[in-house]
């Protein structure tokens, strides 16, 4: 259920950003921003989701049997995920240079959004590792609630930021809001994991 709430809150704030953006940008700009965000999220979850599906149940099962081994596996997975997500970020940054020329003129202008979004995969990786695998797989009902609360806080922060950045920076501001929100999630997940790191 906390995982569902996290997905729901993420979906809500990302859709709300597009709605707010509609008051300040043309449909063409919104389309380019949305394309850039979809490219970023597709690359992130194409890589992160399989890793999570493989290691989440292993860590969760192991935490009930041998806590020290579960934490050891968590540490190894953390290094793997963060390394891979950093590579994804570099790939997004690099692709921002040549993607418009490959896909055509309709995609010109995506580069600036993709360069901002290039910072997001690492933050998503941090939030995923410390949140899903740390607070949930290694945790208990209490830490699952903390996981849920992080996304509520992030959604509120996102709403506040979008009314600050979007009116002045339009789609660039929206890209900053998305990236900043994922950074907020990552920081709060690390904080809560460190706070409850002895739960297992």
Task: Show the residue positions of the predicted features.
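Alpha-helical transmembrane segments of polytopic membrane transporters and translocases
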Residues: 2, 17-18, 31-48, 80, ...
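Interfacial/gating helices of multi-pass transporter permease domains
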Residues: 3, 21-41, 107-111, 171-176
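Transmembrane helix-bundle signature of multi-pass secondary active exporters and lipid flippases
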Residues: 10, 33-53, 84-88, 117-125
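Membrane-interface helix-loop junctions in multi-pass transport and translocation proteins
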Residues: 29, 96, 100, 154-187
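Helix-loop junctions and terminal segments of transmembrane helices
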Residues: 36, 40-67, 131-137
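C-terminal transmembrane helix end/exit motif
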Residues: 51, 55, 125-126, 131-134, ...
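Interfacial segments at transmembrane-helix termini and the short loops linking adjacent helices
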Residues: 94-123, 139-141
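Membrane-interface junctions at transmembrane-helix termini in multi-pass inner-membrane proteins
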Residues: 119-150
